[in-house]
C-alpha cells in the first residue's frame, strides 16, 4: 500500500520505486544504529554491531532492489524503539504496519504481550497498556483475513500452498539456527572468547544438533516448481558450490554451525530462565523472546529463505551482546 501510494504520486517506474527503497534504507540504517546505541556500553560497539547488520548481503540487496523487506525492517525497528520508549500509540501504528508488510512480523506484538504478562506485577499500568496495544496491532490483519476469507489472497494460496503439505516444517528451525550464526560470525567469535564453555551445555547442544539433523534443509515443492532456487539462500549456495551438493563435507560444516547456533541458544535460554526465576524483568528480554518466537513461528511459512533472517538479526545480535555485556543502568534509563 505504501509503495502503491508513492507510485500514484511519483510514478510507478522502477527508478521511482528504487528511490523510495533507498530512502527507507537510509532511515532503517539510522534506526539500527539508534537501537544499538540505547543498549551498548560504548559508541563504537553500536557502530560495529550496525556494520554487522548493514554489510549482510541481503540487507544490502533489499536496500537497492524494490522489495518490501526493508520497509518491514524499518517498521519493526520503529515499533520496538517505541515500545522501549513507552510510546504505545506509535508502537501500535508501526507494529500493525509491519504485520501488513510481512505477516511474520507478528512476533513483535506477541513478544511484547508475553513480556507484559511477565512484567505485570512490577509495572501494572505500562504492562496493561502494552498488552492491549499488542492486541490492537492485529486488527488490520484480521480485517484482511475477513476480506480474503482466508489467511492470504486466493491467488497466493493457489500458487504457493501445496495440498497435503506439512503445516509445520521443523527443518526451517534447522535452517535459521544454522545460518543465523554464519551471518553474525564475528560476534560469534567474540561470544566464544568471552564465555566459559560448559560441558553440560556442549552435550545438550550436540543433542539438539543430532535431533535437528533428522530435519535437513528442504525447499518446498512450490518453490522448486515456481522458481529456479535449489538452495535456501546465498550462503547455502556458496557452500554447495565449494563443497558439493549433499557432500559429506557440506554436512559436516553445516552440522558444526548448527551446533554453534544451538549452544548460543542454550546460553540465551539459560539467562532468560534466570531472569524469570529471579523475577527480574527488564526490557532486554524482549530480544530473546523475539528470537524464540521467530524460530517457533517461521516453520508455518510456505517457504524458507535466508533472507528472512534479515528482519530478526538486529534483535538477535542485541540479545547476544547483552548476554556478553550486561548493562542494567542503560537499560533502565531507556524508558525515561
Q: What kind of region is each of these model predictions?
A:
Residues 1-12, 22-23:
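Short hydrophobic/aromatic helix or loop-helix immediately within or flanking a transmembrane segment
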Residues 19-40, 78:
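Transmembrane-helix motifs of polytopic, lipid-linked glycan transferases
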Residues 31, 52-55, 62, 71-94, ...:
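Specific aromatic-rich, kink-prone transmembrane helix
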Residues 38-39, 84-93, 116-129, 191-198, ...:
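Membrane-interface junctions at the ends of membrane-embedded or membrane-associated helices
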Residues 49-50, 77-82, 88-103, 108-114, ...:
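Membrane-interface alpha helices of multi-pass inner-membrane proteins
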Residues 58-69, 305-306:
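Short acidic/glycine- and proline-prone juxtamembrane loop motifs at membrane-interface regions
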Residues 111, 115, 125-238:
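Membrane-lumen/periplasm interface segments of specific transmembrane helices
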Residues 180-182, 233-266, 304-325:
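Hydrophobic/aromatic-rich transmembrane helices and adjacent perimembrane loops
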Amino acid at each position: 500500500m505504501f509503495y502503491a501510494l508513492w507510485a500514484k504520486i511519483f510514478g510507478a517506474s522502477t527508478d521511482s520505486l528504487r528511490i523510495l527503497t533507498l530512502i527507507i534504507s537510509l532511515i532503517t540504517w539510522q534506526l539500527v544504529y539508534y537501537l544499538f546505541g540505547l543498549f551498548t556500553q560504548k559508541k563504537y560497539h553500536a557502530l560495529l554491531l550496525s556494520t554487522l547488520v548493514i554489510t549482510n548481503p541481503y540487507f544490502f540487496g533489499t536496500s537497492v532492489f524494490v522489495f518490501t523487506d526493508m520497509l518491514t525492517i524499518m517498521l519493526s525497528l520503529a515499533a520496538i524503539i517505541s515500545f522501549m520508549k513507552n510510546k504505545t500509540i506509535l508502537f501500535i501504528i508501526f507494529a500493525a504496519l509491519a504485520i501488513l508488510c510481512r505477516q511474520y512480523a507478528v512476533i513483535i506484538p506477541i513478544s511484547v504481550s508475553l513480556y507484559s504478562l511477565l512484567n505485570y506485577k512490577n509495572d501494572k499500568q505500562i504492562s496493561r497498556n502494552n498488552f492491549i496495544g499488542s492486541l490492537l496491532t492485529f486488527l488490520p490483519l484480521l480485517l484482511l483475513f475477513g476480506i480474503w476469507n482466508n489467511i492470504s489472497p486466493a491467488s497466493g494460496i493457489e500458487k504457493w500452498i501445496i495440498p497435503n503439505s506439512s503445516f509445520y516444517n521443523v527443518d526451517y528451525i534447522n535452517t535459521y539456527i544454522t545460518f543465523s550464526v554464519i551471518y553474525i560470525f564475528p560476534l560469534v567469535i567474540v561470544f566464544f572468547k568471552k564465555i566459559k564453555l560448559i560441558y553440560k551445555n556442549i552435550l545438550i547442544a550436540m543433542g539438539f544438533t543430532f535431533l535437528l539433523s533428522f530435519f535437513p534443509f528442504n525447499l518446498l515443492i512450490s518453490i522448486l516448481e515456481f522458481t529456479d532456487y535449489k538452495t535456501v539462500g546465498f550462503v547455502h549456495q556458496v557452500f554447495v558450490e565449494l563443497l558439493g551438493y549433499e557432500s559429506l563435507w557440506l554436512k559436516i560444516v553445516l552440522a558444526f554451525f548448527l551446533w554453534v547456533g544451538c549452544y548460543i541458544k542454550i546460553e540465551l535460554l539459560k539467562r532468560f530462565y534466570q531472569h524469570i526465576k529471579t523475577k527480574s524483568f527488564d526490557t532486554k528480554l524482549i530480544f530473546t523472546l523475539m528470537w524464540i518466537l521467530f524460530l517457533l513461528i517461521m516453520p508455518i511459512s510456505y517457504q524458507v529463505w535466508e533472507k528472512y533472517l534479515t528482519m530478526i538479526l538486529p534483535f538477535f545480535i542485541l540479545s547476544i551482546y547483552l548476554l556478553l555485556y550486561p548493562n542494567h543502568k542503560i537499560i533502565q534509563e531507556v524508558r525515561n
